[in-house]
Regions:
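C-terminal motif of bacterial Sec signal peptides marking the signal peptidase cleavage site
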Residues: 15-19
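Short, low-complexity, glycine-enriched hydrophobic/amphipathic alpha-helices that associate
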Residues: 21-88
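Generic structural signal for residues in well-ordered beta-strands
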Residues: 96, 149, 190-193
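A generic secondary-structure signal
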Residues: 49, 136-140, 178, 182
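Bacterial N-terminal signal peptides that target proteins for export
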Residues: 1-8
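Periplasmic OmpA-like peptidoglycan-binding domain that tethers envelope proteins to the cell wall
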Residues: 155-232, 237-239
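A short, charged
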Residues: 135-166
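Periplasmic peptidoglycan-binding/tethering modules of Gram-negative envelope proteins
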Residues: 55, 59, 73-147, 223-239
Length: 239
């Protein structure tokens, strides 16, 4: 099963609420040995997007990349491998795979049964979705508290653009509220929530070329290495 790259210490897990290769530990070592600056640019891109200052983000990212050496890269890769394995164990009814997120960064995607998540036109989590999220929070987020979380909501093409944009944001907010409320995930761990509505680039289609509306109604959760994790890796204390 293909593993994902650690880009400037960045790694992602995408949960959709609707091959074989090197481990992150090995890739982290290779990254630390030769790709620090490029990896730093990946961190910088995330920082720039979050702050609205691309120039500052690039500068910060470059510095972070230089700072992440062979040992630190391996430690971050190993930690993200553990988080990935924990997600796979917690979500045995889901598919865990490597993919690229919307920014082109390699990520681990955990795909749940879309039918248990949201009903059409609704942003309320269904009972099965709550059970899956609670297990994910307990066995992954609450244990790997040094990862940052980004939540993205999506809608099917049913309804108006404006309605679906609001609906997708509501779905992302519903997931955040459940994770930070019932599941007691630290609110500061969730760095962003965003709705994309029925953006054509993100709709899901079946083999017949028609939209799979149930699959389009989803939330994606990305996990990536926090500055805390990077600092601990550089200090050699990351467990």
């Amino acid at each position: 099963m293909k593993s994902f790259k650690t880009i400037a210490g960045v790694a992602g897990i995408s949960i959709l609420l609707s091959g074989c290769g090197a481990s992150n530990t090995l890739k982290g070592s290779l990254i630390g040995a030769g790709g620090g600056g490029a990896l730093g640019a990946g961190v910088g891109a995330l920082i720039g997007k979050a702050t609205g200052n691309a120039g500052k983000g690039a500068a910060i990212g470059a510095a972070a990349g230089v700072a992440v050496g062979t040992t630190a890269g391996a430690l971050i890769g190993r930690k993200m491998d553990k988080a990935k394995a924990a997600a796979a164990a917690a979500m045995q009814d889901a598919t865990v795979e490597t993919t690229k997120d919307g920014r082109g960064l390699e990520a681990v995607k955990v795909t749940l049964d879309n039918g248990v998540l949201f009903a059409a036109g609704k942003s309320d989590l269904q009972p099965a979705a709550k059970a899956s999220l609670k297990k994910f929070a307990t066995e992954v987020l609450n244990i790997y508290s040094d990862v940052d979380v980004s939540i993205q909501g999506f809608a099917s093409s049913d309804g108006s653009d404006a309605l679906n944009l609001t609906l997708s944001q509501g779905r992302a907010n519903a997931v955040k509220a459940y994770l930070t409320g019932t599941c007691r995930v630290d609110p500061t761990q969730i760095t962003s929530t965003e709705g994309f509505g029925e953006n054509p680039d993100f709709l899901v289609y079946g083999p017949d070329g028609k939209e799979d509306r149930a699959a389009s109604r989803r939330v994606e959760i990305y996990l990536y290495a926090s500055q805390e994790m990077i600092n601990a890796a550089n200090a050699g204390t990351l467990q």
